[in-house]
């Protein structure tokens, strides 16, 4: 098992942990329907960047 040779200082420990935070998801509003969805994902009603790309159960 690996064992550190020297103790890591509080500064280095903080730098090591600097990217361990949680980030809120990026949300976007669909321009045709006004529905909120995650960026670069299809909205729940099947639209992506203003175009219908997926058939849903509610389609006729």
Swiss-Prot record:
One of its GO terms (biological process) is translation. The keyword Acetylation does not apply. One of its GO terms (molecular function) is structural constituent of ribosome. One of its GO terms (cellular component) is large ribosomal subunit. Residues 1-60 are annotated as: Disordered. Keywords: Ribonucleoprotein, Ribosomal protein. Residues 49-60 have a biased composition (Basic residues). Belongs to the bacterial ribosomal protein bL32 family. This is Large ribosomal subunit protein bL32. It comes from Herminiimonas arsenicoxydans.
